[in-house]
Design a protein with these regions (language model features):
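Hydrophobic structural patches
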Residues: 1, 5-12, 20-24, 184-195
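Extended intrinsically disordered, low-complexity coil regions enriched in Ser, Thr, Gly, Ala
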Residues: 13-16, 183, 195-210
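Non-catalytic DNA-recognition/assembly elements of restriction-modification systems
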Residues: 18-46
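Sequence-specific dsDNA recognition surfaces
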Residues: 36-47, 58-91
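Short coil/turn segments at secondary-structure boundaries
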Residues: 48-56, 150-152
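A short beta-sheet element
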Residues: 81-144, 154-157
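A short glycine-rich beta-alpha junction/loop motif
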Residues: 114-120, 153-179
Length: 212
């Protein structure tokens, strides 16, 4: 949302070295690197068909089981051998554009059980001292959109971003120390929980008024 965008991208391109809004005690510049320094492509496939938990990457709901999204299983075990296996805290990029995700959603897989995703998706996994909660918020912001806009080729299909894997992992990113990453992610998550709770109160009040 807007809060994440303001917290994670204080400049026009989202790559401010020293964000204007900081927690007390943190004043060192953010690290500057490529996505490949923090993440590696995940290419493990479901060759033996062992995993049947097909996961969809929805712009609104994130990574959820296909059976929950469509109310039934669409893919069958005969055609999932080419699907990628994802595990807890892996990230998945769905290049399909939508009004909610103009450059396609990048979502973190929060479920504990392994799942499989379409080979049309790009899967990647954190390496080293990376806080996946922070980067979940990072990818929910628009900090990376300009790079995809400048680098990707949407000419082939207007509804889908076309970007080479090497170009995707060359994406420039800026991020703070792991301690500050955790603090930022915790802060944004707390705000989101507060907003959700307030929305629940509003919804319940509306239901009450309709019933009176």
């Amino acid at each position: 949302g807007g809060g994440a965008n303001r917290a994670l991208s204080s400049s026009s391109n989202g790559l401010e070295k020293r964000p204007k809004l900081r927690f007390p005690g943190f004043d060192e510049p953010w690290n500057e690197s490529k996505l490949s320094a923090c993440f590696a492509k995940n290419i493990k496939k479901n060759t033996d068909g062992r995993i049947s938990n097909v996961i969809c990457n929805s712009a609104k709901m994130g990574l959820i089981p296909q059976r929950d999204y469509f109310d039934k299983d669409i893919a069958n075990s005969d055609n999932t051998s080419g699907y990628y296996i994802i595990e807890h805290n892996d990230f998945v990029y769905n290049p399909r554009k939508s009004s909610d995700a103009p450059y396609g959603p990048i979502s973190r897989y929060a479920c504990p059980d392994a799942g499989i995703v379409s080979p049309l998706y790009l899967c990647f996994r954190a390496k080293g001292d990376v806080d996946t909660n922070f980067f979940e918020w990072y990818f929910r912001s628009f900090a990376w959109h300009r790079y995809i806009y400048m680098t990707g080729d949407s000419g082939a299909r207007h509804d889908r971003v076309s970007i080479k894997d090497d170009d995707f992992f060359s994406m420039p990113i800026r991020f703070p120390s792991s301690i500050e990453q955790k603090k930022i992610a915790s802060f944004l998550s707390a705000i989101e929980r507060r907003i959700s709770f307030q929305q629940l109160l509003v919804d319940n009040l509306k239901k009450y008024k309709r019933g009176v």
